[in-house]
Amino acid sequence: MGIMMMILGLLVIIVCLCTALLRWNQMRYSKKGLPPGTMGWPIFGETTEFLKQGPDFMKNQRLRYGSFFKSHILGCPTIVSMDAELNRYILMNESKGLVAGYPQSMLDILGTCNIAAVHGPSHRLMRGSLLSLISPTMMKDHLLPKIDDFMRNYLCGWDDLETVDIQEKTKHMAFLSSLLQIAETLKKPEVEEYRTEFFKLVVGTLSVPIDIPGTNYRSGVQARNNIDRLLTELMQERKESGETFTDMLGYLMKKEDNRYLLTDKEIRDQVVTILYSGYETVSTTSMMALKYLHDHPKALEELRREHLAIRERKRPDEPLTLDDIKSMKFTRAVIFETSRLATIVNGVLRKTTHDLELNGYLIPKGWRIYVYTREINYDTSLYEDPMIFNPWRWMEKSLESKSYFLLFGGGVRLCPGKELGISEVSSFLHYFVTKYRWEENGEDKLMVFPRVSAPKGYHLKCSPY
């Protein structure tokens, strides 16, 4: 009996302590002028609930507090915005104190000069440098021929395989395609070394920044250091060779006729940015497009008709051109609808540089603002039957210009590689649907939060078309 009373007393103390901690944390952030919301536990906030419940957490908070509320997620006090017009304002007004505010682990691993970390003149320099690498002329003369050659060869022989894990294949595809555009002279062992380190880096960017052995963060930092070493060695070799290279690294290192001269560190950060920024969006969009096309035969029929018409105009070995990519209207619609329905990117983070008024509330300096776009993608007032895969909705070009179109970010942070990414996915779909028919091999489950993935892979059986 005595032991039971002790246990009961201990439980009461724990409950009281937890309640007190929750109340204390809520009072810490109950400043006058803040939007409504809850802050969860000290230090951890509501991150656990956010990651565990995902979209349901956001839906519940929206029902309780509206489309603009406070929380404590991703390691810091955060304002969540789900209002389409307000989101556009936030993204369009970096100069008013709404700068990029990505998690510390991402900034540490991607580098202090990466395009997501800098703003003002530094951002203009890095963005200008990146845009010069993927201009229409560069796309036409250099990038697209390399992408086409890579996709044509990468997709060969899949019908000889018992099963194809599309998730694994598209991840490797996105990474290898980018790496070969950056440094086309790399040998296979060098490519494998980059690949091994890069996949560790990706995991590290989405980890808690605890720098102790065994953590994903430590592994990510070490992977970034190893990639820096590999890049430094490659850049030194190129400097000593005196040769001219026409890949992205060659243009970044070019001293003559280069408006955007970067330091060696800025070049390394730019290379990692190029590898990282397109990796998940290109790979996941490619995988999910095949999933939706499999489930919607009419959409697949329309897409295949578009690509077969292009092939009929060409010799068997003739590559895709930029004009071909531009002519793929339905393919572009499939890519947009896949990005919307799967919500490849859940939102965008901003940070306040000073106390500022927003939506009638006073947001303190240093708080993050999470422009949460997932709910907007499924808003019935914006999209008819939003839970249905309907690429035809995007054939109306004006939909891309709507204020709530944030699939690629917005404002000065609009994804600079948008058209390059679309070209890569379009090329992948072109060669896949003209080479193969496919069926799902098993009942693989897909997760949609915190990132779209197939925990055990997404397996297909391919046969010749």
UniProtKB/Swiss-Prot annotation:
Tissue expression remark: Expressed in stems, hypocotyls, leaves, siliques, shoots, and roots, with a higher expression in apical shoots.
Family matches, as InterPro entries: Cyt_P450 (IPR001128), Cyt_P450_CS (IPR017972), Cyt_P450_E_grp-I (IPR002401), Cyt_P450_sf (IPR036396)
Matching CDD domains: CYP90-like (cd11043)
EC number(s) stated in the UniProt entry for this protein: 1.14.14.180, 1.14.14.-, 1.14.14.179
Lipidation (S-farnesyl cysteine): 462
Gene Ontology terms for molecular function: brassinolide synthase activity; heme binding; iron ion binding; monooxygenase activity
Main enzyme class: oxidoreductase
Assigned keywords, A-Z: Brassinosteroid biosynthesis, Endoplasmic reticulum, Heme, Iron, Lipid biosynthesis, Lipid metabolism, Lipoprotein, Membrane, Metal-binding, Monooxygenase, Oxidoreductase, Prenylation, Steroid biosynthesis, Transmembrane, Transmembrane helix
PTM comment, free text: Isoprenylated (farnesylated); this addition of a 15-carbon farnesyl isoprenoid to the carboxy terminus is required for endoplasmic reticulum localization and essential for the biosynthesis of brassinolide.
Source taxon at top rank: Eukaryota
UniProt function note: Mediates Baeyer-Villiger oxidation and catalyzes the C6-oxidation step and lactonization in brassinosteroids biosynthesis. Converts 6-deoxocastasterone (6-deoxoCS) to castasterone (CS), and castasterone to brassinolide (BL). May also convert 6-deoxoteasterone (6-deoxoTE) to teasterone (TE), 3-dehydro-6-deoxoteasterone (6-deoxo3DT, 6-deoxo-3-DHT) to 3-dehydroteasterone (3DT, 3-DHT), and 6-deoxotyphasterol (6-deoxoTY) to typhasterol (TY). Also seems to be able to convert teasterone (TE) and typhasterol (TY) to 7-oxateasterone (7-OXTE) and 7-oxatyphasterol (7-OXTY), respectively.
Name of the protein in question: Cytochrome P450 85A2
Species the sequence originates in: Arabidopsis thaliana (Mouse-ear cress)
